[in-house]
A protein has these predicted regions:
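Structure-specific DNA junction-binding interface
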Residues: 1-77, 183-187, 191-193
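Small-residue helix-packing motif on alpha-helices
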Residues: 86, 98, 121, 170-173, ...
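Strongly charged, low-complexity linkers/loops
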Residues: 124-174
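Anionic-ligand binding region
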Residues: 103-115, 124
Length: 193
């Protein structure tokens, strides 16, 4: 319903912030990363939001980056993962590190989140790994005939697409990186520029 809310940060609490937008105070649940990125009370901010509607409650969830919001949306699409569990996961890792954890089957990183056990972490990996590999990934191998992408580079491109890169930008970021490196190393080098 709301894509973003732009206003003044008026309050920070343990798991939510309050943003005043034109005289209306919005209580927005957020991850620890977004809480830290929001800055000081009194500062103008833009929060990308998701409105979660249940029978008796409407909760607003917000993020300081579109990448974090996109990862949140991916997480709540997983069977058994609600908005609070998704926030918990995003509070212990960044979207980039989370994407690497999913692609490399790193259950340990995901289970660091409060309330997320090994079974839920495995379900998250199982359901999101395929989405991350196929999510709007368009690789034109005809133009890359001299440089066929390795599986690791393909997975790294998929992770970058999930993080908000266009498929062309992701391919360009990974193009010069050695395909024999691990997926995690390729992603780190691509993000470093």
């Amino acid at each position: 319903m709301y894509y973003y809310i732009k206003g003044t940060l008026v309050q920070k609490n343990d798991n939510y912030i309050v943003v005043d937008a034109n005289g209306v105070g919005y209580m927005i649940y957020t991850s620890l990363n977004s809480m830290q990125n929001a800055g000081e009370v009194g500062k103008k901010i833009t929060i990308y939001t998701y409105l979660h509607v249940r029978e008796d409650v409407m909760d607003l969830f917000g993020f300081t980056t579109i990448e974090e919001k996109n990862m949140f949306m991916q997480l709540i699409s997983v069977s058994g993962v609600g908005p609070k569990a998704a926030l918990s996961i995003l509070s212990v890792t960044t979207p980039a590190k989370f994407a690497v954890a999913v692609i490399t089957n790193d259950v340990k990183t995901i289970t660091k989140a409060s309330g997320v056990g090994p079974k839920m972490a495995q379900r998250v990996i199982l359901e999101l790994k395929d989405k991350m590999k196929t999510d709007e990934l368009e690789i034109d191998l005809e133009d890359e005939s001299d440089d066929i992408l390795s599986d690791n580079r393909s997975e790294a491109i998929s992770a970058l697409v999930v993080l908000g890169y266009s498929s062309n930008d992701a391919q360009k970021a990974v193009k010069g990186i050695d395909g024999t490196l691990s997926v995690e190393e390729i992603i780190k080098k691509a993000l470093a520029g």
